Every structure is written in structure tokens, then in C-alpha cells.
A protein has these predicted regions:
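N-terminal cap/lid subdomain of alpha/beta-hydrolase-fold enzymes
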Residues: 53-121
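Conserved acidic catalytic loop of the alpha/beta-hydrolase fold
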Residues: 133-153
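Conserved hydrolase catalytic core segment
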Residues: 150-193
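Alpha/beta-hydrolase-fold enzymes
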Residues: 175-259
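Active-site nucleophile elbow and catalytic-triad environment of alpha/beta-hydrolase enzymes
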Residues: 268-284
Length: 358
């Protein structure tokens, strides 16, 4: 599975996005092996290989790291997605909000994603059934044990990474100065969001070609799952602009499904979608200590603002506030979370408000 977040952004952007590597330090890639990792399900993996990327250099103040920034990807994503121009080109360059010559930026491929251990590596449906709690623990191990980072200037994430941001604030409340979840809600996944996820899971599992995860060729049920995935993250405004006729709309869809079928793995997608089953931060929101800014967009069909959930729940976060980005030609539905130009002014404000006095 290439990535839910990038799949959405690519489908919405409908353009080739270049890396802005020349404007910030080159990322360094690394791996960390966690031995005998025990999952919340009770399953164990002898070696959990965690892949990560970092930009910049660690800085310490009185023996403690004071410039680390954790950025977490969405369902099906990886850390590399944040190196695209629409994100890194707006944030990581000199003088930009997360200037990589000033901050130490951490981009981790979560369990089941990117170059980190996942079902398609060989275990297929015998891979441990990981959940968000496992992913948070593994992220923390990479940061604390491999990178020796004891404090985070900022924790932020998009979509699933946004949900992880809420969980980080609850699980490690004294470890960060600020939190910025994007395109997420701090409640159990339910309603239409859960129904769409179940549709994707059922589309794969009920396909005889899936063969309980031991398929040789991609099961056709993956097509149904990808169709739902595309609609979940779509922007009616952007898609109408890109495909204003019947023929262009058909080609738009056919081209993307054909490409994703070559790139994606059914088991990986199945596990990625199912991993949200334990997400339920609502009852512990009061445990969050750091200032938190939750950013969603008005055209996000996964987290539609008319539900009023974010506005209701943010009141339970001591230093929390919410910002809803209005629909415009610059928003891209759920995928707005990766278009940093749309919301980076809010990030600048958060960083300014939480800057420690020297």
C-alpha cells in the first residue's frame, strides 16, 4: 500500500510534486530493530524492523534535547511523503516554520508501513495484528532508545498521524511542548467513517481470491477497497475541476486504480485499516498537558465539521483549541493536511505561543 494520505493528495493534486531537497538538509535514513516486540494482541515478532528518516541536528539545553519535532504519517503512508514540495517545501527550508537547520525533524515509517516490517514482507496474514497502541510504543522506542531524544519540541501528524498525536499527548504528557493533530478527531472511529473502513475490509476478506491472505495475485477485492478509499479522501471541488466531463472522470478513476493495483498490497491495506480498532482517546483528553492545536478542513469527508465533535471535545483539553480551514480553491478534502501552505500560519502561531523563554 503506497499510502492513504499520499494516495488522496496525489489524486486531488493531479500533478507531479517535486522534492525541495535543495532548500533544506538532506534526510538521513536509518533502521532500528526492536527484538521480541510484544503486541497488544499477545502476538510477538522476534524482530520488528523500524525505518526512520531525520533532518537536521539534535540540540541540547542543560542536557536535554530541545529542538526535536516528530511528524507522523497517515494510514498507508510513510515518512517520505513529508519530503514532497507541498509539505517540506513549505516547512523545512531556511526561515520556514520547521527550519531543518534549526530543528531535528523525525519521520518514522510506522508498523505495517513503508520500509518498516509489514505483512507483505513475507508473513502475509500471519503477521501480528498490530493496533495504534503498538505503533505508539514502537515510535517511542525509536525516538527514546535509538535517537536518544528525551523531549519533543512539537508532536504533529496527519490523518492517522493526527490520531497518534492525540495519543502521544495522553501517553507521554510531559514529553512535548506542543501538539498539532491534523485531519483527525479525538473519539473512537464510528459512524460513516467506521462503515467505510469496514466496507474496505469486507471487500478484501470476502473475496475468494484473497485466500485468507495467501494469494499469489492481487485479489479483485482490492479494487473495491481502493474505490472506497479514493472517495473517502476526495474533494468534490478539486475533482470537478480535474474531471469536468464524463470521459475525463472515467479516465481519472481508471488511471488511478490501475496504478494503485500495481503498487498496493491487499494484506498491507487490510492491516492498516484494521489497526484503528483500538483508537479511543476521548476519556483521557484531560491528561493532555501541552498546548494542543487541532486543525481540520471544512471539506474533509472523513471528519466532517457538521458533526461538531472536534468543537465539543476540544473543551476537555486544558490548553486546547481547534481551527477549521474553510473550503477554498486551496483545500483538498481530507488531503488538505499535507498541503502545508493552507495551514502553516496556524503552525507558526502555535510555535510562537509555546516557545520557551531563555
Amino acid at each position: 500500500m503506497k499510502r492513504l494520505a499520499a494516495l488522496m493528495a496525489a489524486a486531488l493534486a493531479c500533478c507531479t510534486v517535486a522534492h525541495a531537497a535543495s532548500s533544506y538538509p538532506a534526510p538521513a535514513e536509518g533502521d532500528y530493530v526492536i527484538r521480541n516486540f510484544k503486541f497488544a494482541s499477545g502476538e510477538t515478532l522476534p524482530e520488528l524492523h523500524m525505518h526512520y528518516r531525520t533532518l537536521g541536528t539534535i540540540h541540547k539545553n542543560h542536557g536535554h534535547v530541545d529542538n526535536a519535532v516528530l511528524v507522523m504519517h497517515g494510514t498507508g503512508g510513510d515518512g517520505a511523503q513529508f519530503l514532497r514540495d507541498i509539505f517540506a517545501g513549505e516547512l523545512f527550508g531556511a526561515g520556514q516554520p520547521l527550519d531543518a537547520t534549526k530543528y531535528f525533524i523525525i519521520l518514522i515509517d510506522d508498523i505495517g508501513h513503508g520500509k518498516t516490517s509489514k505483512p507483505s514482507d513475507g508473513l502475509h496474514a500471519k503477521f501480528p495484528h498490530y493496533a495504534y497502541a503498538d505503533m505508539i510504543l514502537a515510535e517511542h522506542d525509536v525516538i527514546a532508545k535509538k535517537l536518544a531524544v528525551d523531549h519533543l519540541r512539537l508532536v504533529m501528524g496527519t490523518s492517522m498521524g493526527g490520531m497518534h498525536t492525540w495519543l502521544w499527548g495522553e501517553t507521554y504528557p510531559d514529553m512535548m511542548d506542543a501538539l498539532m493533530p491534523l485531519a483527525s478527531l479525538p473519539v473512537q472511529i464510528s459512524g460513516r467513517n467506521r462503515m467505510m473502513r469496514k466496507m474496505m475490509i469486507d471487500s478484501i476478506r470476502t473475496d475468494p481470491e484473497w485466500k485468507n491472505g495467501d494469494y499469489a495475485q492481487p485479489p479483485h477485492g482490492l479494487v473495491g477497497a481502493l474505490n472506497i478509499l479514493l472517495v473517502m479522501g476526495s474533494s468534490p471541488l478539486q475533482w470537478q475541476k480535474e474531471a469536468p466531463t464524463r470521459d475525463s472522470a472515467d479516465k481519472f478513476l481508471d488511471d488511478r486504480i490501475a496504478r494503485y493495483m500495481k503498487e498496493d498490497d491487499a494484506n498491507d491495506l487490510l492491516y492498516q485499516i484494521d489497526s484503528s480498532r483500538d483508537y479511543d482517546p476521548q476519556s483521557k483528553l484531560s491528561a493532555i498537558k501541552a498546548p494542543l492545536l487541532a486543525v481540520n478542513s471544512a471539506d474533509d469527508q472523513i471528519n466532517p465539521p457538521e458533526l461538531g465533535i472536534l468543537e465539543r471535545e476540544i473543551k476537555n483539553v486544558s490548553h486546547g483549541r481547534a481551527f477549521i480551514i474553510p473550503i477554498s480553491d486551496a483545500t483538498h478534502g481530507h488531503g488538505t493536511h499535507t498541503w502545508a501552505a493552507v495551514w502553516k500560519d496556524q503552525l507558526v502561531k502555535l510555535m510562537s505561543e509555546t516557545e520557551r523563554k531563555k
